[in-house]
Amino acid sequence: MVHWADYMAEKIIRERGDKEEYVVESGITPSGYVHIGNFREFFTAYIVGHALRDRGKRVRHIHMWDDYDRFRKVPKNVPPEWKEHLTKPVREVPDPWGCHESYADHFMSLFEEEISKLGIEADFLHASELYKSGEYAKEIRLALEKRDEIKAILDKYRERAKQPPLEDSWQPVMIYCPHCRKEAEFVSWDGEWKVSYKCPHCGAEGETDIREGNVKLRWRVDWPMRWAHFKVDFEPAGKDHLAAGSSYDTGKEIVEKVFGWKAPLTLMYEFVGIKGQKGKMSGSKGNVILLSDLYEVLEPGIIRFIYAKARPNKELRIDLGLGLLNLYDEFDRVERIYFGLEHAKNPEEEEELKRTYELSMPKLPERLVAQAPFRFLVTLVQMPHLDEDGIIRILQEQGHVPENLTDDDIERIKLRIRLAKNWVEKYAPDDVKFSLLERPPEIELRPEIREAMLEVAEWLEEHERFSVDELNNVIFDAAKKRGIPSKEWFKALYNIFIGKDRGPRLAPFLASLNREFVIKRLRLEG
């Protein structure tokens, strides 16, 4: 099967023709934290650009910060007095936390920092700078000249949606008051470069030159204008922008009839959420998961893998609970398939999985770097007697990583150790968490179980070195020969070590503990 990004890249080349440079675009209004749902738009544009580059094409990925949009409402996590800044450009609203030049910069800088960890580069542009520099001045004037044509297009779609037409006073632009910087009322246009305004906030009246940057195109005109200005070939969009009669439909007509360019190809991307979290994430509401939250428990390549393997038009729910362990298992399997150490069900699946891995890695490794099983690390990081070196030693003894480790191997293992610790602290359900009991609990055990425990203890005393499989067989045989049901037997063993009825896989767990400690505990001596 062809990966969806490759399919899109081929379609772009086929429909846009052979070009010297292809332009892909993404865009976000920094009105709140840029969350993992917003990231889907950015990554979809990036990965399609990646697929184009893999075909030898030159690609420019523009990420447009729509920081000249109005500050529409005060989020819950912002002081209420920030309402005095409503309708100003978000780039000109002060940072409530006092650490950045503006409200918008606070969110933009964090996202750009997060992106760099994923090995992704893009051309970050700021709408505020483009408008203020006069870059869009000719297009603004053109939109004013063709105001009636634009209004007719918008009204046509409004009629189809059974909505009333736009008011006769409607204009394709909005104005920021040069004095107080809040949204002013449009009065008139002189037919050339000046528009008259009246500010309902500070009372100022006058003229402003389009080239001075106080005049901004409204969204449904701004978007198609950008497509033409930057010669955009591809831009993904959320389903709200791609519904019938929405901004993509109107933009498609406006860009052709007003700005003389063909609308870019697009892909609809679906909602991204966290499994178990109700409702849609909102950067202004504050109920968001950021890329930096994912970095606490996932390798960068696995974050990219989540988005690369899922078709954009499918809803994506990231499981930070037990499902995260399955995600690590899945990624490690795909990585082994890529390096030829395992095989998929069939050649088609293998080809797609290998391609997904290529698109997932910030930098493709030349070999398989040591994979410390995340599930097992979740157990090991909860053992107080093990530091990082001790954990690595256990991994080597039990055959999970090679005896001879390179710096890259050690770096990756230590990263996973830190991620496993974070996961246990932040997301692990209670039945996964445990702590070793300092002394045996006072519980009643029937004689057969005591005998089985002593048998395992004697075997351990006779064997300084052993494999996990050997220990596993001894544990099962000791119970089987005495007719002890497995459930009862394991419950007893977990209780004497961690005081719970269930726990991590028993044989690897016991093999990770000090042998003398295990022997004494099985004898209920300490």
Swiss-Prot record:
Q: Pfam families of this UniProt entry?
A: Anticodon_2, tRNA-synt_1f
Q: How the cofactor binds, per note?
A: Binds 2 Zn(2+) ions per subunit.
| Superkingdom field | Archaea
* Cofactor(s) listed: Zn(2+)
Mind naming one GO cellular-component term on file for this protein?
cytoplasm
This enzyme catalyses:
tRNA(Lys) + L-lysine + ATP = L-lysyl-tRNA(Lys) + AMP + diphosphate
Task: Name the Enzyme Commission number(s) assigned to this protein.
Answer: 6.1.1.6
User: Could you tell me which NCBIfam families the record lists for this protein?
Assistant: lysS_arch
Q: This chain belongs to which protein, by name?
A: Lysine--tRNA ligase
Q: Give the originating organism.
A: Thermococcus kodakarensis (strain ATCC BAA-918 / JCM 12380 / KOD1) (Pyrococcus kodakaraensis (strain KOD1))
